[in-house]
Design a protein with these regions (language model features):
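Carboxylate/His-rich catalytic cores and anion/metal-binding grooves
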Residues: 177, 181-182, 193-194, 217-233, ...
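N-terminal export/assembly leaders
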Residues: 20-98
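Alpha/beta-hydrolase-fold serine-hydrolase catalytic core, especially in secreted/extracellular enzymes
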Residues: 96-176, 354-469
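Primarily recognizes the serine-hydrolase "nucleophile elbow" in alpha/beta-hydrolase
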Residues: 268-335
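Cap/lid segment of the alpha/beta-hydrolase catalytic domain
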Residues: 188-272, 312-322, 328
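The feature captures the conserved acid-bearing segment of alpha/beta-hydrolase catalytic domains
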Residues: 317-377
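Glycine-rich active-site/cofactor-binding loop and its immediate structural neighborhood
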Residues: 155-212
Length: 469
């Protein structure tokens, strides 16, 4: 057969095959190919992880190109649960879409829309009340009755200028929250108190996990040496809570309810102590601990000062179900809320927002902080909100962040910060004893829970239901 005749036959076969295809098949193209076409058509650069997008295809790809780049990218990416964000004059990133994170630009637009709805202090207070009630209702906390707060203490020890004692609180019948209380060794009268929840910081052993980590011990002990009582406590289904509930339950929505409830009960406990000044109670935590900081401050006026660290963001809602696993940001009959609005509910109470340059708080000085100042201005109290931004720091509660917090708390709660400063005036944490995790176990090495301790989330749900009767 002659070559020319062979080519003709092949072309005819190809034509017949194409004629037998549906439009969906004809226009189906690999995403990588489509994105390259976008770059060529609009003269832009798209940055993305090829492995992350591997195997994805675009239906009716050729028909998703419009006169403007934005519409084109929306039509291509949204059906695939992808999103884009402008990062330069003609460059964009393409990433997976997650329900708990938006783009920086969308976060800024959201704040702009929200602030326009607060004509004055009165309208803000109305919105604040609605958001607060929504947080309580969605978590199922509104109707929960408080049971007697049983307190179990163990392993009291003394260190340089402070003491530590392990404490478990029975926050619901048969449900225990474990923590450690740090106090100054010597004090007179009533002293300030701080809640210290932790975030999602992991280690190979308990010594590097959650509240047992050195950074949490440093901040609690240093505050105690300065003159405050500090309650450091574990997240739900972490630490000793995992003796009752499997750690996997931490990553479910019930964890959000329990962590908020735990913070409320910690407040109850601190307010019950005769040596604690109820007018000087604050809270600070990083990452997921920052989320807990904002939520408890938003819903409970007993918190008089807050320091949310590496968490407050207009576009990031918290990547764990213990932070965003329930629709606490979705307001019926009103615009959606976000963590900046939650944070603003602290106003006019003192708040320090600590941010860094390597996570979702990287734009805080430009986006979130100016917005917060506008809310505080409604009360004439702009001086009560501050931002310490550390552009070269990473996502943690490291020394640079801790010293900013020490200074802020000392100024507002009249703590004796000179006690923990060296001759140059720099904060010195060398007098803190870093304990192994086992020293902080309320139920000891034997992990002996009280006899009435429940086990499993099904039992917990029944207890919660009983608390609403």
């Amino acid at each position: 057969m002659k070559p020319q005749k062979c080519i003709t036959i092949l072309l005819l076969l190809a034509a017949r095959c194409s004629q037998g295809q549906t439009p969906a098949q004809v226009y189906l193209k690999p995403l990588g190919e489509v994105l390259r076409n976008v770059e060529q058509t609009y003269h832009v650069t798209l940055k993305y992880d090829k492995k992350e997008l591997e195997g994805l295809e675009v239906k009716y790809a050729d028909w998703k190109f419009f006169s403007d780049l934005g519409t084109t990218l929306d039509r291509i990416l949204i059906p695939l649960d992808l999103q884009y964000e402008k990062i330069g004059e003609k460059s964009y990133t393409v990433t997976k879409w997650d329900y708990y994170i938006k783009t920086f630009a969308e976060g800024a637009r959201h704040l702009d829309a929200l602030i326009k709805s607060y004509a004055d202090k009165e309208s803000w207070e109305k919105r604040k009340a609605i958001v607060k009630q929504n947080i309580l209702d969605v978590q199922g906390i509104s109707g929960m009755k408080k049971s007697p707060l049983r307190v179990i203490s163990s392993n009291f020890r003394k260190h340089d200028g402070y003491s530590v004692e392990n404490v478990a609180l029975e926050v619901l019948p048969g449900v225990y929250l474990s923590g450690s209380v740090y106090k100054p060794l010597k004090f007179k009268g009533k002293i300030p108190a701080m809640l210290s929840p932790h975030g999602h910081f992991y280690g190979d052993t308990d010594d590097g996990n959650g509240r047992y980590r050195p950074d949490q011990q440093y901040r609690c002990a240093t505050l105690a040496k300065m003159g405050a009582a500090v309650f450091s406590y574990s997240m739900f289904a972490w630490g000793e809570s995992a003796l009752q509930f499997d750690n996997k339950e931490h990553y479910t929505s019930i964890a959000l309810t329990m962590q908020t409830w735990n913070s409320i009960r910690v407040l109850d406990y601190l307010c019950s102590l005769d040596y604690v000044d109820p007018e000087r109670i604050g809270v600070t935590g990083a990452s997921g601990g920052g989320t807990q900081t904002m939520i408890i401050t938003a819903i409970d006026d007993r918190i008089r000062l807050s320091v949310p660290t590496v968490m407050l963001s207009a576009h990031f809602y918290g990547g764990c179900a213990c932070e965003s696993g329930l629709p606490i940001h979705q307001i019926k009959g009103g615009p959606q809320s976000n963590n900046v609005e939650f944070g603003a509910m602290a106003a006019p109470r003192p708040m320090l927002v600590i941010s860094d340059g390597t996570d979702w708080t990287q734009n805080t000085p430009k986006i979130e902080f100016p917005w917060l100042k506008k809310i505080y201005a409604l009360y004439g109290m702009e001086k009560n909100v501050e931002n310490v931004h550390l552009p070269t720091d990473v996502h943690n509660y490291g020394y640079n962040k801790r010293i900013a917090m020490y200074d802020f708390v000392a100024r507002h709660f009249a703590l004796k910060d000179k006690i923990v400063k060296d001759k140059t005036g720099k904060f010195d944490e060398s007098g803190v004893t870093i304990e192994p995790a086992v020293e902080m176990y309320t139920f000891g090495k034997e992990k002996r829970l009280p006899e009435n301790a429940i086990h499993g989330v099904e039992a917990l749900r029944r207890v919660i239901q009983d608390a609403k009767k």
